[in-house]
Amino acid sequence: MVNGRIPSVFSKTYVTPRRPYEKARLDQELKIIGEYGLRNKREVWRVKYALAKIRKAARELLTLDEKDEKRLFQGNALLRRLVRIGVLDESRMKLDYVLGLKIEDFLERRLQTQVFKLGLAKSIHHARVLIRQRHIRVRKQVVNIPSFVVRLDSQKHIDFSLKSPFGGGRPGRVKRKNLKKNQGGGGGAAEEEED
């Protein structure tokens, strides 16, 4: 770090499909994008790549002997990590179950999906907008990344930000305008719907 710049990461976080126009895969990806409110195919490929790396590690460990030190140490670390993010159930803490994981298991743990499932947003797309506009916090930290992976222990701490109009902060522009009109004008005009 000679010039004070933070070095960038050069490894890709996704892998493009080998066959670009495979109808079954294209349909499946489009269905996933619609269901989880993703922006593009790259978001699907990124999760697919992360899952592939995890499954590859599990397959490698399964080839070793059950009493092998490496298998015990790395296998337990992998399983604990998957349980912590809520992808794997505690009752299924075996490497065999890691091979059965699907993309949907990881997409369910995204902040965008969790905000929608908790009922903080009207739709999965609304959830993405709320997150990007900094209305959502996890514990005390405002998170504005829809792909943020929510840990199991953080799930119950997802809420509206304290500064957000939804969370009791300063009212939004339209609401302030209506309040000002009601105080000053004396109310000849009908009130706009407040959300």
From Swiss-Prot:
GO biological process terms, semicolon-separated: cytoplasmic translation; ribosomal small subunit biogenesis
Location of this chain's protein in the cell: Cytoplasm; Nucleus, Nucleolus
A single MF term (Gene Ontology): rRNA binding
Keywords tagged on the record: Cytoplasm, Nucleus, Ribonucleoprotein, Ribosomal protein, RNA-binding, rRNA-binding
KW Flavoprotein (keyword) present: no
GO CC terms, sorted: cytoplasm; cytosol; cytosolic ribosome; cytosolic small ribosomal subunit; nucleolus; small-subunit processome
Keyword Ribonucleoprotein attached: yes
Main location: cytoplasm
Region ranges (Disordered): 165-195
Domain of life: Eukaryota
InterPro entries, per database record: Ribosomal_uS4 (IPR022801), Ribosomal_uS4_CS (IPR018079), Ribosomal_uS4_euk/arc (IPR005710), Ribosomal_uS4_N (IPR001912), S4_RNA-bd (IPR002942), S4_RNA-bd_sf (IPR036986)
Domain S4 RNA-binding: 109-183
Family: Belongs to the universal ribosomal protein uS4 family.
Role, per record: Component of the small ribosomal subunit. The ribosome is a large ribonucleoprotein complex responsible for the synthesis of proteins in the cell. Part of the small subunit (SSU) processome, first precursor of the small eukaryotic ribosomal subunit. During the assembly of the SSU processome in the nucleolus, many ribosome biogenesis factors, an RNA chaperone and ribosomal proteins associate with the nascent pre-rRNA and work in concert to generate RNA folding, modifications, rearrangements and cleavage as well as targeted degradation of pre-ribosomal RNA by the RNA exosome.
Quaternary structure and partners: Component of the small ribosomal subunit. Identified in a IGF2BP1-dependent mRNP granule complex containing untranslated mRNAs. Part of the small subunit (SSU) processome, composed of more than 70 proteins and the RNA chaperone small nucleolar RNA (snoRNA) U3.
PANTHER family hit by this protein: 30S 40S RIBOSOMAL PROTEIN, 40S RIBOSOMAL PROTEIN S9
The name this protein goes by in its record: Small ribosomal subunit protein uS4
Gene: RpS9
